[in-house]
Amino acid sequence: MSNPLYNKNIISITDLSRAELELIVSTANELKQHPRPDLLKNKVIASCFFEASTRTRLSFETAVQRLGGSVIGFPDSGNTSLGKKGETLADSVQVISSYSDAFFMRHNQEGAARLASEFSSVPVINGGDGSNQHPTQTLLDLFSIYETQGTLDKLQVAFVGDLKYGRTVHSLTQALSLFDCEFHFVAPPALSMPEYIIDELKEKGCTFTQYDSLDGVLSKLDILYMTRVQKERFDETEYQHMKSSFILTAQMFEGVKDNLKVLHPLPRVDEITTDVDSTPYAYYFQQAKNGVYARQALLALVLTNEFGDK
């Protein structure tokens, strides 16, 4: 089989082609339908979280174990040599990678995963670096979109909330730009999509519109991607002002498309009310579950040649 992802670092979604994204999605679907509990037997995966995480870490470690691999690492760097003794990231990566077959990491500094890949002896998978990239979240988002829409092409997609600091929306916008989707960006001016993303869309000839409210947007959509205003990136006064700017309620779904699905990278705060959970449009909990299959697919492709083009 031809597998272009074998032994490859996964640092940014922009490092992946349309064909590679489609391969990951199809592999996730295959593993969801047909589990492979021994695929990573005797493989050791380092799971190193220099920044706190719940869903990403647990999802990734579940993915490893359900493929038969084992996990080493830490959920918080505060008690490691890097946190306690001032060891450099480069030194930590060189040592930890020597114990493992792949290195999965999250870090609060932009570019940390790229730096780690320069010193690692095994493939590095980025679990999020600051407000920059979160490629494995994007892969589970793509899988969830494909699962609900039957395609990734020519969809109407809205991103709502914190579009400035939300690394999930940056990565997913870049990925979907390869599939001729039309974008609707809904955010307060202080949290609008970064100019570099806007410039990339213009260069690719993608269609997009920017809004400061949800009014008139919902009826157009196939996918509504909600995000929280991230408290850790604001002082308390700014956060209280921003957090409730855009709230989705069940009453707002009148006149929407039957195939509309609401996604959210979680955790949610105020931006989706709980009455949305019981509507046919809510898909964020299934989306979170899909993180296991998307990360299984990535591990399967990076560490084995069992999948790919025949």
UniProtKB/Swiss-Prot annotation:
Q: Which positions carry the signal peptide feature in this UniProt record?
A: none
Residues that bind L-aspartate: 85, 167, 228
Q: Which reaction does it catalyse?
A: carbamoyl phosphate + L-aspartate = N-carbamoyl-L-aspartate + phosphate + H(+)
Involved pathway(s): Pyrimidine metabolism; UMP biosynthesis via de novo pathway; (S)-dihydroorotate from bicarbonate: step 2/3
Q: Does the keyword Transferase apply?
A: yes
Question: What GO MF terms are annotated?
Answer: amino acid binding; aspartate carbamoyltransferase activity
This protein's record includes keyword Transferase: yes
The similarity comment for this entry is:
Belongs to the aspartate/ornithine carbamoyltransferase superfamily. ATCase family.
What's the protein name?
Answer: Aspartate carbamoyltransferase catalytic subunit 1
Its source organism is Shewanella halifaxensis (strain HAW-EB4)
| Gene field | pyrB1
